[in-house]
């Protein structure tokens, strides 16, 4: 089930305002250009910010998200008719044969179960064309980002279409590799809504192994330009079945 900040209509409507500027998306747009992708699958597209940016440039985009409330916000935006919107989770992606797939923000970290993560990776691979590229980010556990997720460091009042909203974050549990936290939203009418989340902080080597097991070739691991030293950006290529079989033979022969 998607977290309330995506699934509850009142929270989905203010999501973009709370998030503010998205410099992280500039990097994804540059990678789309780097690989010359003309079709993109946005997994966990949320309110469609990146999908709409790419579609405005003539790129064929499919935006997939499990939260209908977030997709409703995306569909209400100018240019939304250029994007194909699909309500689905990461393990049941449409077979669009995309040139490139992305998972921005914390999307890759919400799949906390190993089997679930493996299913998502296989689903992404199945949605890509042969040699298609997948790009996603994951936080570096050693940087302990959750230590900054507390009220005194995150509190702000944000102007939204719902009026001013008080916002802050509190961590509720740390049992690595899992971190749980709650985001608070206090509206001008006094309503206090909460969205509870759980993320898995996988180390880089564990992620790399999971990618190989799912049939990807690791092309690069980059520093996230908007959070240098704090996040890894993984760039991988979907292997053909013949390549996977060849790799399996090599492993057995070692």
Place the predicted regions along the sequence by residue.
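A short glycine-rich, Lys/Arg-flanked "PGG" loop and its adjoining helix->strand segment in the class I
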Residues: 118-130
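C-terminal lobe and adjacent flexible extensions of AdoMet/dcAdoMet transferase-like proteins
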Residues: 202-254
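Class I SAM-dependent methyltransferase SAM/SAH-binding core
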Residues: 48-92
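A conserved beta-strand element that flanks and buttresses the S-adenosyl-L-methionine
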Residues: 102-104
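Conserved class I S-adenosyl-L-methionine
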Residues: 1-36, 38-44
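SAM-dependent methyltransferase
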Residues: 135-208
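A short acidic, Gly/Pro-enriched loop at the edge of an enzyme's catalytic core
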Residues: 93-100
């Amino acid at each position: 089930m998607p977290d309330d900040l995506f699934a509850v209509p009142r929270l989905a409507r203010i999501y973009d305002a709370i998030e503010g500027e998205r410099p992280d998306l500039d990097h994804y747009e540059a990678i789309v250009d780097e690989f010359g992708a003309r079709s993109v699958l946005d997994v966990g597209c949320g309110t469609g910010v990146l999908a709409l940016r790419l579609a405005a440039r003539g790129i064929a985009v499919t935006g997939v998200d499990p939260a209908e409330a977030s997709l409703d916000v995306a569909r209400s935006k100018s240019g939304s008719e250029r994007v194909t919107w699909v309500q689905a989770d990461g393990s049941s992606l449409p077979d669009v044969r995309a040139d490139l797939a992305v998972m921005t923000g914390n999307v890759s970290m919400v799949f906390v179960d190993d089997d679930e993560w493996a299913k998502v990776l296989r689903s992404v691979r199945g949605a890509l064309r042969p040699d298609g590229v997948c790009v996603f980010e994951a936080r570096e556990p050693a940087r302990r980002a959750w230590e900054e997720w507390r009220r005194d460091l995150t509190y702000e009042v944000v102007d939204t279409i719902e009026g001013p909203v008080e916002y802050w974050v509190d961590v509720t549990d740390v049992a690595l590799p899992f971190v749980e936290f709650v985001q608070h939203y206090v509206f001008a009418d006094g309503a206090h809504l909460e969205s509870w989340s759980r993320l898995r902080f996988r180390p880089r080597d564990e992620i790399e192994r999971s990618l190989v097991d799912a049939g990807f070739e690791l092309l690069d691991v980059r520093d996230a330009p908007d959070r240098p030293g704090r996040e890894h950006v993984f760039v991988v290529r979907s292997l053909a079945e013949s390549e996977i079989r060849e790799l399996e033979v090599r492993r057995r022969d070692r």
